[in-house]
Amino acid sequence: MSIRIIPQDELGSSEKRTADMIPPLLFPRLKNVYNRRAERLRELAENNPLGDYLRFAALIAHAQEVVLYDHPLRMDLTARIKDANDQGKPPLDIHVLPRDKHWHTLLHSMIAELKPEMSGPALAVIENLEKASEQELEQMASALFASDFASVSSDKAPFIWAALSLYWAQMASLIPGKARAEYGEARQYCPVCGSMPVSSMVQIGTTQGLRYLHCNLCETEWHVVRVKCSNCEQSRDLHYWSLENEQAAVKAESCGDCGTYLKILYQEKDPKVEAVADDLASLVLDARMEQEGFARSSINPFLFPGEGE
């Protein structure tokens, strides 16, 4: 199954009535995304061997929150949604969508917000980014979107991605239309932008018990049934791993068919779990999965592979 976004005026009456029964997509609601993430990162930093880095990530998330309100985005995406639907492509496809300089503004505003909080190597990194030309910034963005991580140092990547992510999330939150699930491929990628997930979450509330993958770029969530590999869609050789017990709120779902794994978070076990923060705070589980011979099928926006990884 794949997911397509249909312009509102092209939905049939039956689709309009049933669109909310099992929502294929949950577009980002940006009001509390970054503050909640920052708070969760700070909470998880306590008694965590990665505490310093989690607090560093919290500073970036807080800067995203501030810049979000300082630099709102106004854009009419109606035509783009229609064109993407006609072509069967994600409307905000990272591989073809022209990037507006708005994301440069977001990056420089984030740097200004972060500079008083940074010191040492981290301060040197953002000062270097502050001096980068528009062409250099675009080259780094293109490399990250092409998964050419060797071309962007792992200390610069989180800042570049944070600005791009905020830009894409602003656009995604403005999409006019509904989503429809249909037969197709590439369910492992975000239907809105084509990026990959950071983790998946079994939710509570109106989507109780449903699993949604969370995009590591535009913050959209899309539905994928449980007990099915989110990478290759096989279900015959799935296993679930945790560092605690069967009631753990964070597990890794591994697939013997494709040899990959993805974190799965359970809100019913801990309502405070957050897709990015809890994934980053459980890197010990990632190390265990690598020892077992599985490759990660996702990327955390605060932790990019370095050269040779």
Curated annotation (Swiss-Prot):
GO biological process: protein maturation
Record-level GO cellular component terms: cytosol
Keywords, ordered alphabetically: Cytoplasm
Keyword Protein biosynthesis attached: no
Main location: cytoplasm
InterPro entries membership: FdhE-like_sf, FdhE_C, FdhE_central, FdhE_N, Formate_DH_accessory
Keyword set includes Cytoplasm: yes
Annotated localization: Cytoplasm
GO molecular function: ferric iron binding
UniProt-listed Pfam families: FdhE_C, FdhE_central, FdhE_N
PANTHER family, sorted: PROTEIN FDHE (PTHR37689:SF1)
Family that this chain belongs to: Belongs to the FdhE family.
Functional note: Necessary for formate dehydrogenase activity.
Record protein name field: Protein FdhE
Gene: fdhE
